[in-house]
Curated annotation (Swiss-Prot):
Assembly notes: PSII is composed of 1 copy each of membrane proteins PsbA, PsbB, PsbC, PsbD, PsbE, PsbF, PsbH, PsbI, PsbJ, PsbK, PsbL, PsbM, PsbT, PsbX, PsbY, PsbZ, Psb30/Ycf12, peripheral proteins PsbO, CyanoQ (PsbQ), PsbU, PsbV and a large number of cofactors. It forms dimeric complexes.
Family recorded in the similarity comment: Belongs to the PsbL family.
Organism for this UniProt entry: Synechococcus sp. (strain ATCC 27144 / PCC 6301 / SAUG 1402/1) (Anacystis nidulans)
Gene Ontology cellular-component terms listed: photosystem II reaction center; plasma membrane-derived thylakoid membrane
Name of the protein in its database record: Photosystem II reaction center protein L
Length: 41
């Protein structure tokens, strides 16, 4: 029972952390690309 409840508990946390990291990375990349594209165009 305890191990079964910690497994589903761990997965959402990892997914949440991964999505958060990807979201920050996306914003970071877009933040760099936006000025670069506006400068070139």
């Amino acid at each position: 029972m305890p191990t079964r409840s910690t497994n589903p508990n761990k997965q959402p946390v990892e997914l949440n952390r991964t999505s958060l990291f990807l979201g920050l990375l996306l914003v970071f990349v877009l933040g760099i690309l936006s000025p670069a594209t506006s400068l070139t165009s």
